Amino acid sequence: MNTSIRINCSKSYDDFVEASKFVGFCLYLIPGAILHVLILRILLIKQRKVFRNNSFFRIFATDSVVSLVLIFWGIFFNRLFMFIPPLCPLVSPLFFEPSLFLKMYYWMYNHARMSKSVAQILMVLNRMCCVISPIGYEKIWNKLAVTTVFVVLALPFFGSWNLLLSRMYIFPSYGGFNASYVKYVQWASLSMFQSIFLLIALCFTIICSSVSLYKLIILPDRIKSAEKSLCFVSLFYSIAFLVVAVSQLIFVFCEVCLKNRLYLLFQFFAFDFLTVGSAVIIMLSSPQLSNFLGFSGTFYRRKASPPGSTVVKIFTSVHNNSSII
């Protein structure tokens, strides 16, 4: 489909109000991006020797890169051209004809969304394996180091391949424009694949976190701090993926809801909660990482383990005597 698809930018939106929405998004997206960059700097550069053998942080580093992709496109494309009305008549003509740039943006953005789900599945599996087999799990996961990164980045191709074949176009949205696509393969709906990835990730989060918490509770010497932190982290991810799944299911099953202007804002906030929140939650839950980042306050204070107790590294400790989470 190589025909031109033109749009008329809406003039019914107040420039100041729309720009205020964009600024509002930036107020938390930019700090979130900075936090992800700082975490990656610690994990991959400054303290690489400390964290390189920790399988959980390897997966989280991949997830952080994916989050940065989402934040970058969120700030510099979809929110920018949607909520800054004066840009619409200037920029929109660039995308009336088929555009490789528009295709790569739309593909990367939605591919990254599904990568978040895959990374979450691997992280909760990693935590569960740690609790079930605290001695041997790290050796197994380190053998899968390259595989886990590959899976996070490659598995979403099963949901995004049709975008590479399809025609991208822009349509009026708020005071600017947004992007969508004309399906090349009719049955391969992006919303269907995204819903599948999200619901599977939500199920894995609930099941694996429940198993992990149960195994912690029945330990001979219960580790209260570990139980507390696991509950905290699991609750966050469960709520985050539930909210995102609800926003996606509304898109699939409630056509009337899509006409409501608030729906798109809700979907943005739902994904942003997961994208930005993942960096915040890992910082609050890992005393070691928090200290490397220069933050004195953490979610909990380290407590000495009782003599003879089993130290379980749920996901943030990198040495046998590290702080438990």
From Swiss-Prot:
Tell me, what is one Gene Ontology molecular-function annotation carried by this entry? transmembrane signaling receptor activity
Q: Which GO terms describe its biological process?
A: sensory perception of chemical stimulus
Instruction: Write down the superkingdom of origin.
Output: Eukaryota
Record keywords, A-Z: Membrane, Transmembrane, Transmembrane helix
Gene Ontology cellular-component annotations: membrane
* Subcellular location as annotated: Membrane
Write out the transmembrane intervals.
Answer: 25-45, 65-85, 87-107, 144-164, 187-207, 232-252, 264-284
Matching InterPro entries: 7TM_GPCR_serpentine_rcpt_Srg, Nematode_SR-like
Mode of membrane association: Multi-pass membrane protein
Which family is it part of? Answer: Belongs to the nematode receptor-like protein srg family.
Q: What is this protein called?
A: Serpentine receptor class gamma-16
Q: Which source organism? A: Caenorhabditis elegans
